[in-house]
């Protein structure tokens, strides 16, 4: 974390930092460029979750905190041995250290999704009895990154197919409504930039892999389960 962030050729950290910096200065967040001239792709919930780290002066610290939370979850739900093994595997992983060095938040996002899924499994939270609550959670998770909902799709995909059409419709509407509510403040702020801008977060998140590919992957994972 002592590496000069401006010397990095990865701009995920500045996509968050500059978003929040612009927001607190009254400038439209999704119009703020990264230090490499790009634009931020994370959705609002993920940006807002980084406010404490922004206040501390380093949004890259989120990977440290979420990793510790992930290991604590494994220790609490499984055993200290499981947490230790996973911790060792992370420590010997070049990809993990790369994520830390460049202050990336992608693995952090996925670990947080895994933490949520692990607790839902541990608490035996069934979709049929918790349609509204789980839909709200999925909607908020969707407002981090599109790929972040894959663990929840795998977890609840089969149960969703067992619901009647009314509950299925309610579930999807609540997800869409929750996600929309997180986006609306930025639509009202400067909707043309968010919705019709060439580099809006919807475009950036699907540019390297279409939404159809994501949907096929999620459906395939559900089928396997």
Question: What feature does the model see in each segment?
Answer:
Residues 47-49, 87-111:
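Aromatic- and kink-enriched transmembrane "portal" helix at the membrane-lumen/periplasm boundary
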Residues 51, 94-95, 130-157, 181:
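Membrane-interface alpha helices of multi-pass inner-membrane proteins
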């Amino acid at each position: 974390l002592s590496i000069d962030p401006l010397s990095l050729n990865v701009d995920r950290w500045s996509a968050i930092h500059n978003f929040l910096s612009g927001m607190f200065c009254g400038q439209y967040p999704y119009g703020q460029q990264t230090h490499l001239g790009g634009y931020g792709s994370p959705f609002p919930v993920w940006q807002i979750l980084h406010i404490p780290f922004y206040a501390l002066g380093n949004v890259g610290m989120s990977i440290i905190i979420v990793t510790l939370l992930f290991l604590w979850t494994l220790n609490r739900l499984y055993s200290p041995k499981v947490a230790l093994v996973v911790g060792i595997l992370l420590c010997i992983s070049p990809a993990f250290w790369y994520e830390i060095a460049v202050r990336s938040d992608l693995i952090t996002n996925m670990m947080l999704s895994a933490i949520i899924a692990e607790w839902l499994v541990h608490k035996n939270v069934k979709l049929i009895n918790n349609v509204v609550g789980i839909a709200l959670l999925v909607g908020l998770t969707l407002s981090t990154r599109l790929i972040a909902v894959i663990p929840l799709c795998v977890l609840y995909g089969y149960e969703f197919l067992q619901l009647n059409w009314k509950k299925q419709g309610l579930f999807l509407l609540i997800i869409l409504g929750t996600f929309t509510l997180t986006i609306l403040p930025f639509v009202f702020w400067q909707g043309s930039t968010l919705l019709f801008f060439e580099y809006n977060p919807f475009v950036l998140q699907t540019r390297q892999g279409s939404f159809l590919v994501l949907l096929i992957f999620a459906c395939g994972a559900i089928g396997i389960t």
